[in-house]
């Protein structure tokens, strides 16, 4: 039996200012740091010993992982960063205040962009200075792999190959894994491992800085799930 822990990054500066973040690399807020440190204390109390850690290439998730591992006295364990664990790319909405976007396009349209499983947001052009194509952390990628915007369906298609190739084999081998990532990349993984429908996943929320602990059998079926708070 292997343990799998998901942690959505602690509150970010743009969570605090109510902005669409996506692939923009913003930092944790002071509250976000506190949440990540608290996650570490909860994991230490739970007594979970990890073999491997995974996170995205975005600062808010990386720092959350480090605070959580430091708090549970496991900062030394092997760590892998992957762009495939990044947040959903919000396209041209990135950087915009959510309330102002609702005023511009209407509450219903913005709600559809945020919550529909397969509706894309307005796309960010590759020539835009804010495009990830201009960020050297993605220089190794085929430019065609860099999205201009994603829905949850596309995010799932991005995340699952990494799960299948990197994370699942270690869990099958009995290793305990921690994944510190983002609301939508973790919702995508949650949908996959819990076999949640396209409709029901839209109601699943990932709280910032809250560890979610799974016990998985040798076939990666969920035996138990609990949230630490």
Swiss-Prot record:
Coiled coil: none annotated. Substrate binds at residues 8-15, 21-22, 60, 87-90, 98, 114-115, 183-184. The keyword Ribonucleoprotein does not apply. The record marks 182 as: Transition state stabilizer. The active site is at residues 9, 87. Keywords: Gluconeogenesis, Glycolysis, Isomerase. One of its GO terms (biological process) is glycolytic process. One of its GO terms (molecular function) is phosphoglycerate mutase activity. CDD domains: HP_PGM_like (cd07067). It is an enzyme of class 5 (isomerase). Pathway: Carbohydrate degradation; glycolysis; pyruvate from D-glyceraldehyde 3-phosphate: step 3/5. It holds the Pfam family His_Phos_1. Its EC number is 5.4.2.11. It catalyses: (2R)-2-phosphoglycerate = (2R)-3-phosphoglycerate. SMART domains: PGAM. The keyword Isomerase applies. NCBIfam families: pgm_1, PRK14115.1, PRK14116.1. Belongs to the phosphoglycerate mutase family. BPG-dependent PGAM subfamily. Catalyzes the interconversion of 2-phosphoglycerate and 3-phosphoglycerate. This is 2,3-bisphosphoglycerate-dependent phosphoglycerate mutase 2.
């Amino acid at each position: 039996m292997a343990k799998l822990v998901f942690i959505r990054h602690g509150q970010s500066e743009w969570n605090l200012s109510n902005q669409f973040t996506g692939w923009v690399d913003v930092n944790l807020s002071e509250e976000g740091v506190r949440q990540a440190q608290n996650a570490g204390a909860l994991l230490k109390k739970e007594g979970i010993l990890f073999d491997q850690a995974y996170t995205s290439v975005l600062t808010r998730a990386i720092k959350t992982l480090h605070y959580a591992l430091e708090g549970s006295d496991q900062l030394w364990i092997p760590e892998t960063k992957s762009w495939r664990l990044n947040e959903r790319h919000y396209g041209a909405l990135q950087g915009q205040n959510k309330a102002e976007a609702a005023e511009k396009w209407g509450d219903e349209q913005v709600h559809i962009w945020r919550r529909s499983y397969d509706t894309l947001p307005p796309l960010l052009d590759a020539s835009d200075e804010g495009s990830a194509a201009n960020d050297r952390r993605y220089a190794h990628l085929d430019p065609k792999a860099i999205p201009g915007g994603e829905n949850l369906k596309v995010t799932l298609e991005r995340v699952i190959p990494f799960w299948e190739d990197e994370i699942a084999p270690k869990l099958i081998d009995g290793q305990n894994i921690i994944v510190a990532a983002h609301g939508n990349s973790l919702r995508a993984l949650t949908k996959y491992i819990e076999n949640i429908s396209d409709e029901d996943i839209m109601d699943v929320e990932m709280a910032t800085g809250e560890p979610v602990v799974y016990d998985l059998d040798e076939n990666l079926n969920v035996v138990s799930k609990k949230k630490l708070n």
